[in-house]
């Protein structure tokens, strides 16, 4: 949905920004009119019909009514996330989690009566984001705490990530989700990788 909105020139403040919820919804319904024959168009109406029992077509003239009806239903116990998942027979949901995440909510969910499995997925993007040295070093400090070890070189980084990966696996993680924007095709030696890492850690 966000990609579709961006493609239609919707300002980011209406997508991930701080605009009011209805204003964001309204921008979505405006963008949806350009998604005819795109799965997004059909998925949106399937969601409205199957989950909310709303069979109206979402467009600028119906947006407010549909928004208000959905909002009212979402305030009821029958429309809590867990209730919807059970009603829709959802067997597994995977969340996107950083290696430093403690996954405490996954433990709570496992101990609850929810039949749907909620499993973590490994997303280590920040462990590779060396472009901003200050932000990267702040992240390494958090990773050190999560892995309970010092990160003084590249091997330490890999070892810390392995420890966290093992922990994630113990919590049911079987998937990874990577947001790598650029794949660097140049071959690097171990010494070059170490030098780059240490330069980022200065």
Predicted feature descriptions by range:
Residues 1-202:
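Metal-cofactor-binding active-site regions of metalloenzymes
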């Amino acid at each position: 949905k966000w990609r579709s909105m961006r493609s239609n020139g919707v300002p980011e403040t209406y997508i991930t920004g701080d605009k009011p919820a209805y204003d964001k919804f309204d921008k979505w319904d405006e963008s949806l009119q350009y998604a005819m024959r795109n799965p997004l168009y059909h998925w949106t109406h399937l969601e409205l019909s199957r989950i909310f029992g709303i069979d109206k077509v979402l467009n600028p003239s119906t947006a407010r009514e549909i928004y208000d009806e959905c909002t009212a239903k979402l305030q009821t116990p029958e429309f809590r996330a867990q209730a919807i998942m059970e009603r829709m027979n959802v067997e597994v949901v995977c969340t996107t989690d950083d290696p430093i995440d403690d996954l405490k909510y996954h433990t709570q969910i496992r101990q609850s009566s929810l039949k749907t499995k909620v499993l973590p997925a490994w997303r280590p993007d920040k462990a590779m984001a060396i472009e901003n040295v200050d932000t990267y070093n702040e992240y390494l400090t958090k990773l050190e705490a999560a892995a309970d070890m010092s990160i003084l070189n590249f091997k330490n980084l890999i070892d810390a990530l392995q420890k966290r990966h093992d922990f994630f696996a113990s919590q049911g993680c079987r998937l990874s989700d990577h947001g790598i924007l650029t794949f660097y095709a140049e071959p690097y030696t171990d010494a070059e990788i170490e030098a780059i890492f240490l330069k980022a850690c200065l």
